[in-house]
Amino acid sequence: MRLSRFFLPILKETPKEAEIVSHRLMLRAGMMRQEAAGIYAWLPLGLRVLKKIEAIVREEQNRAGAIELLMPTLQLADLWRESGRYDAYGPEMLRIQDRHKRELLYGPTNEEMITEIFRSYVRSYKSLPLNLYHIQWKFRDEQRPRFGVMRGREFLMKDAYSFDIDEVGARLSYNRMFVAYLRTFARMGLKAIPMRAETGPIGGDLSHEFIVLAETGESGVYIDKDVLDLPVPGTDVDYDGDLTPIVKQWTTAYAATEDVHDGARYEREVPEERRVHTRGIEVGQIFYFGTKYSESMKALVAGPDGVEQPIHGGSYGVGVSRLVGAIIEACHDDAGIKWPEAVAPFTVAILNLKQGAGDTDAACERLYRELSAKGVDVLYDDTDQRAGAKFATADLIGIPWQVMVGPKGLAEGKVEIKRRGDGTRENVALEDAVERLMA
């Protein structure tokens, strides 16, 4: 993509309403625009990141055996009355009527609807286990939306729902999602730590939050430092095998949010030199809620003995749009964003330091053409901005690799490559630049 043809509305000053780093940088970098309190338009740069994150989430859900569908944003109020949650949910649920006075709601979550879909088609235990997921926009009418996409009213979520004949099977499904989440966040360059959590309005008695450590996080967390060094399962993980050892490994060392923190246990089990008290951002949560919805909504299947029984369910959420902010909170410096390569809007930025000069134009065009042919996402800054402004823009929007092409370097047949993550620079021959970037 040529920057001269791309829509990138960079802001020179930080809007006053932006309180945290991710909100400030997303606005300044032209990733989004606020349309109403807690509601944002995703501009091209931000949308590219959102799509990269969504793709990783989808790939790991598919790898774990979940099956994608898509449910509507609007739901019938009667479904929620059937489960008993319509009145239990507070004013954060947006309730509306259509022209026929039918009561609807803008779904904040989808347990009722997925249960309705399941009970309409599945009759036997032979169709289980089953895990269905979708990635859809949701709305919760937060009383005080703030922090940009971290606590907005409209947000993109991945929701998966598992169905099993009994608790044993349901816990196996829970473990699959537990491991899938470890892999999902690791692929995004994040260290997300699973912590035992309250179940809240979802219900059930088993839940884990996945927390990314960040000083600007909304939750205080207490962890054993050893958990930071635990290995993440590789692509060869067997989702049909016994995942209990992996789950046990990740849940044995102490890790808790302040809501469920046990100070006495923490001091008893964790040596002082391994205690870490910091803050974190929730990027996902998983639940096992048993027969909470299947009993009230009569989602029954015939067991091996032919007798109908309620299924055991679980739900598994990832805040896709929230992850954009969480990654920025964990990956930034004073100059701007430092995107992990897997989620960056572009992988390489080519900076033409003397636009209009024949040699620099030709070298940039060559690099742009060769990298694009190899499938690399390239942003070619072919604008007439001065070099300093180009450096600042590339740093602000966080492109992982920057290639500086100027007449001084080209006089020696070289270009300069900068790695945004750690700031390292190296001069390489022009003809070797593509190979170096592909290494």
Swiss-Prot record:
EC numbers on record: 6.1.1.15
Keywords: Aminoacyl-tRNA synthetase, ATP-binding, Cytoplasm, Ligase, Nucleotide-binding, Protein biosynthesis
Main location: cytoplasm
Domain of life of the source: Bacteria
GO biological process, one term: prolyl-tRNA aminoacylation
Entry function: Catalyzes the attachment of proline to tRNA(Pro) in a two-step reaction: proline is first activated by ATP to form Pro-AMP and then transferred to the acceptor end of tRNA(Pro).
Protein name: Proline--tRNA ligase
Lineage: Bacteria, Pseudomonadati, Pseudomonadota, Alphaproteobacteria, Hyphomicrobiales
Protein's gene: proS
